[in-house]
């Protein structure tokens, strides 16, 4: 069974933890388009599964929220 975009993004961030990633980096690592990553990361942020860890210029860096 294939993973949903949400699952692919979360898995990518979990694999890189404790490092944070930009939308562009997540897109490269998952093979998804950056617009798709942006759409789904926004939803994951609203659900409290990821958060912005810092900003580098205009880019937002994301990290998973561990329990």
Task: Name each model-derived stretch.
Residues 1-6, 20-22, 54-67:
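Short, cationic-aromatic polyanion-contact patches
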Residues 14-18:
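Short helix-capping/hinge SLiMs at alpha-helix to coil transitions
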Residues 25-27:
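A short acidic, leucine-rich amphipathic alpha-helix
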Residues 40:
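Residues in the recognition helix of alpha-helical DNA-binding motifs
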Residues 43, 47:
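Alpha-helical DNA-recognition elements
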């Amino acid at each position: 069974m294939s993973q949903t975009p949400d699952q692919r993004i979360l898995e990518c961030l979990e694999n890189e933890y404790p490092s944070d990633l930009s939308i562009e980096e997540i897109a490269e690592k998952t093979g998804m388009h950056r617009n798709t990553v942006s759409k789904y990361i926004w939803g994951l942020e609203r659900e409290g599964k990821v958060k912005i860890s810092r900003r580098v210029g205009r880019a937002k860096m994301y990290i998973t929220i561990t329990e």
